[in-house]
Design a protein with these regions (language model features):
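A conserved ligand/cofactor-binding region detector
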Residues: 1-824
Length: 824
């Protein structure tokens, strides 16, 4: 329903006025990018009214607030999503058409805000969407990165990282809020004194460098309920203006020192930490946004509440992974050094306010900091962590007298390292995993000692995705079809999709469903032709793997299987082979050389396969450059097959698997993460599962016995595929892929051969791929499988996940902004 403020004539007039006001141009003279800005400011004007109404309701109703703290928020484009949530998309599209403008072209002008990279950031974005839609009060807390992680270019098959300058034209949906700026301190030292009245030590942090954290707010709209929450991202500015006096005297270095300190903190997401300076910068980033966010939260609480001891009644901090876990010590610092609480009081408050989400089973991803770095950069924070550690070790000794192995495994500070996950578990009142299997592995393997000591803290919250972004916005053809058949309630209650099952044997419905899939494939094929120069057949099977490039996600297994299929087709050209298009999209971290080499291999295989006339275009390989939310929406809608092939026990949950499922793509995957729960919902007959179980993998890792060389020696086809990596088939430089070849077969001091069991799962994967082909050839059977994946995806909404967080962890109250739009 069109918001009353979106009268078409008023809207058109406002767009023209904004073009004139912003650019001194008429609509006819303006560029498409300028028109995007003008349209966005028109929409923002309406959003701000709702934002103000929401703030008024929050102030009057005084609800408990969740501060969702995350290094990443991968929001995606805002214009179209905001229009859908306002209920004004169709009317605005018509208004723009009357001005001679195409809403799709205008939406394409918007840069993806470069505030995240992978699933961690996209989950945070989905959660904010659900919190607003479900009428809860929330703040997202993060960093306003000027250049994101990087913009990926592919040159000669290699990933090239260039700055993602998403702010170069200004971003219309953010608002600078300098009046809420906070000071953050680094370095210096702590002077310990004595308070004779309180008869206790005092701690005074002196000699520090300061940075000003300046907030920028982005509105997070609920769907059709007028609730607007806030994503608050912090930019860094120097405390003092540029030192012109120093500059005039020739001391340029001193003059720009403050400027550089601030700028470096917010320049990029995840600076390369292969070296000391990179590690220091990452720790600075984490403390910077955590300190600013906590200062703001405590200040906000104190405006309306007198008793700081009751902070947990109104505030909860959810730490998304280990990056924000320094929040534990920072909250203690604020409560003791600024609010005057004693240790026991501060601990009582902190341990009721902070909760931790674990996102990884892989121990190397659980952050640790060198004591030397941590204590130098954050001396007061380190002191507090030392004391938390001392008291915790006393607890462990009481529970397990004389068990020094327990202390070694559980200590927060040990062997010159500060272990952030341990800090979060010890201090937090809740520790959650993000899929049922993941949580069980945490409890029984990785965090077993902590689970035995604090079983009441551990719980599972299986991840989810927002259907409003990944179906309503990303696949409007399918969304409209679903609404025509079961009504619109699924938009805010995804379990309603189960009503579609009555159409699972309806030939007309299935044909319409597959026609929509084909139209989405045509749209993606057009994008691939425009961006890759590769012509792909929308009648072929679109087999898609899009996610961060990491060895455990096994893009290498996928491309080795493509080589295997290519060899088979070359050997048996007469074979009845159903055409396949293998689509990859992934960024590799700038310092992750193996991952970057896998990207090069994918592109080298594509060069050979796509240009071999003897296979008649039956296999195509495409690597989509600069994978991000805006092209992801198009990819999910077009996929036939969802590749979820990580090594079992390594993927905490995954959410791409849910997005593919929602859009009607059956999964080929291992029984890991949320794949397990997807198969439970849709049935094994509607998925293609393969590979070793997580128990088998964990057993091999603990006890040995896995030998990839044995597989290499007895399986001639696998051996041929690997030899082709080093015999010039895919590069005239026979050493180019030698390190990938060696990683699969050669055990080194630091790493065993084939760490992620690629050869061990290869045959099982190839067999599953054969089952995919056989199923797809039977189009009636495939249509039903694909359709049931959509119909059975109701569990995987982030709305369901958020309600579980609210019930079990956060204990929030719903806020009513528009009484006619209150959700139960």
């Amino acid at each position: 329903m069109l918001d009353k403020q979106f009268k078409k004539e008023t809207f058109k007039k406002s767009v023209k006025e904004n073009v004139k006001f912003l650019y001194r141009k008429t609509l006819e003279e303006a560029t498409q990018e300028q028109i995007f800005q003008a349209v966005s400011y028109t929409v923002k004007d309406v959003i701000i009214d709702h934002w103000l109404e929401s703030q008024k309701a929050f102030n009057e109703q005084d609800p408990k607030i969740v501060y969702y703290m995350s290094m990443e928020f991968l929001m995606g484009r805002a214009l179209g999503n905001n229009l859908l949530n306002l209920g004004a998309y169709d009317e605005v599209r018509e208004a723009l058409e009357e001005l001679g403008l195409d809403i799709n072209v205008i939406e394409d002008q918007e840069p993806d805000p470069a505030l995240g990279n992978g699933g961690l950031g996209r989950l945070a974005a989905c959660f904010l969407d659900s919190l607003s839609t479900l009428n809860y009060c929330a703040y997202g807390c993060g960093i306003r990165y000027h250049y994101g992680m990087f913009k990926q270019k592919i040159k000669d098959g290699y990933q090239i990282e260039v700055p993602d300058n998403w702010l170069k034209n200004g971003y219309p949906f953010e608002m600078k809020r300098p009046e809420y700026a906070k000071e953050v301190h680094f370095g210096g030292h702590v002077e310990v004194g004595w308070d004779p009245v309180k008869r206790e030590n005092t701690f005074n942090h002196v000699g520090y460098q300061s940075v000003l954290a300046v907030p920028y707010d982005m509105p997070i709209l609920g769907y059709d309920n007028k609730v607007v929450n806030t994503l608050r991202i912090w930019d860094a500015e120097p405390i003092v203006d540029f030192g012109l006096d120093s500059f005039d005297k020739g001391d340029y270095k001193k003059a720009v020192e403050q400027e550089n300190l601030a700028r470096n903190i917010v320049e990029v997401l995840y600076p390369n930490d292969n070296h000391y300076a990179g590690k220091e910068l990452r720790l600075k980033q984490q403390y910077f946004f955590v300190s600013a966010s906590l200062q703001e939260a405590v200040e906000k609480y104190k405006k309306n509440h007198d008793d700081i001891m009751k902070l947990s009644d109104k505030v909860v901090f959810q730490m998304n992974d280990t990056h924000p876990t320094v929040a534990v010590a920072e909250l203690m610092r604020i409560l003791m050094d600024q609010e005057g609480l004693g240790w026991d009081q501060a601990w009582a408050v902190t341990s009721k306010c902070v909760a931790y989400t674990n996102h990884t089973i892989m121990s190397e991803a659980l952050e640790k900091w060198p004591v030397e770095l941590f204590s130098r950069l954050l001396p007061r924070i380190y002191q507090i962590i030392e004391e938390i550690n001392r008291r915790f070790i006393e607890q462990v000794q009481q529970k397990y007298p004389g068990n020094y192995e327990k202390i070694r495994k559980m200590a927060i500070i040990y062997d010159g390292q500060v272990k952030m996950a341990h800090l979060a578990i010890v201090a937090g009142f809740s520790v959650n995993g993000v899929a049922r299997l993941h949580t069980e592995i945490l409890k029984n393997q990785e965090l077993k000692d902590f689970y035995e000591m604090f079983p009441e803290k551990f719980n599972n919250k299986t991840n989810g995705i927002t259907q409003r972004r990944f179906l309503l916005h990303g696949n409007q053809l399918l969304a409209n079809w679903i609404t025509e058949h079961i009504g619109p309630d699924w938009i805010t209650d995804l379990s309603q999709l189960n009503k579609l099952t009555v159409y699972a044997d309806d030939e007309k419905a299935l044909q319409e469903f597959m026609n929509i899939k084909f139209r989405n494939k045509q749209r993606l094929a057009k994008y691939i032709l425009e961006h890759n120069g590769v012509e792909v057949d929308p009648h072929s099977i679109f087999d898609v793997q899009v996610k961060r490039l990491h060895e455990y996600k096994r893009q290498l297994l996928n491309i080795l299987h493509v080589i295997y299929l290519y060899n088979d087709l070359k050997m048996h050209p007469e074979k009845d082979f159903y055409p396949r298009t293998f689509i990859f999209g992934a960024k590799a971290s700038a310092g992750y050389h193996t991952a970057k080499k896998i990207i090069k291999l994918i592109n080298s295989v594509a060069d050979v396969v796509n240009n071999d006339p003897s296979i008649q275009g039956k296999i195509k390989v495409v690597f989509i450059e600069n994978y991000r939310v805006s092209n992801a929406e198009m990819i999910f809608a077009a996929a036939d097959v969802s590749e979820q092939i990580c090594t079992a026990s390594k993927e905490a949950s995954g959410t791409g698997n849910m997005k593919f499922m929602l859009n009607g793509a059956p999964t080929i995957g291992t029984m890991d993460g949320a794949n397990v729960e997807i198969v439970e919902e849709v049935g094994e007959e509607n998925a293609f599962m393969f590979g070793m179980s997580s128990d088998q993998i964990i057993n091999y890792e603990r006890n040995g016995g896995y030998d990839p060389n044995f597989i290499y020696n007895i399986d001639t086809e696998i051996r041929q595929v690997l030899i082709q990596l080093i015999n010039g088939t895919f590069s005239s430089d026979t050493e180019l892929f030698r390190d990938l070849y060696d990683s699969l077969l050669t055990t080194k001091v630091s790493d065993r051969a084939d760490r992620y069991f690629i050869l061990g799962d290869f045959r099982s994967y190839a067999d599953a791929q054969k089952r995919v082909e056989e199923a797809y050839k039977d189009q009636k059977r495939w249509a039903k499988m694909a359709f049931l994946n959509t119909a059975k995806s109701g569990k995987f909404s982030s709305d369901r996940t958020i309600e579980e967080y609210v019930k079990d962890i956060w204990h929030l109250d719903k806020v009513i902004v528009d009484k006619s739009k209150t959700r139960k």
